[in-house]
Amino acid sequence: FHKEKYHLLRLTLNGAEAVSEKFTDPAEAEQAAAMCKGAAVTCTSVTKEQKKEQPPKLYDLTTLQREANRLFGYTAKQTLDYAQSLYEKKLLTYPRTDSRYLTSDMAETVSCVIHLAAKLPPFDGCSNFFPLVETMISDKDVSDHHAIIPTMEIEKADIKALPLGERNLFLLVCCKLLCASAEPYVYEAVTATFDCCGHSFTAKGKRILSE
């Protein structure tokens, strides 16, 4: 397997952009560009498909370490140390877990925690927020310890007083909890194909239906 260079033509249509098929020959691409410049364009097909993306799962230790590294550059040990310190301060649940779900007996508690987290900056701009707890519950997917979430203690905690690393990690866990309790992201994927001088161009877009 080896990479092969190719060229694409881009067609601007009322603010949208359609992309041509691949040209491996530069001369052929230039010829097609010359032919299409100022030429008539015909829409040959439009397809629409409704798609749904489920909310993300909660953090276990591994996924928390990965995301903290990607966003903040923290090492796995740094993330564990910050999470352990937050656990000892009773702001996060036990961090050494391999589960990304909660148990059914936590449903009422986590609902309260979600509403508390939604009041914290920078999440306090959320309005009309109705969390869905059911998607986070799975008794069979929890062995020794459930997923990492904030605790009820956040109601009286001074988050701004936390050291930067701990504060970043704490807000990251809060953000994941809020995202995990959101409704599915539903959108309509639209694909349109166009013909210009015998060359095919494709434009793709989406229309948000629910988020």
Where are these regions (language model features)?
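Core catalytic DNA strand-manipulation module of type IA topoisomerases
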Residues: 1-211
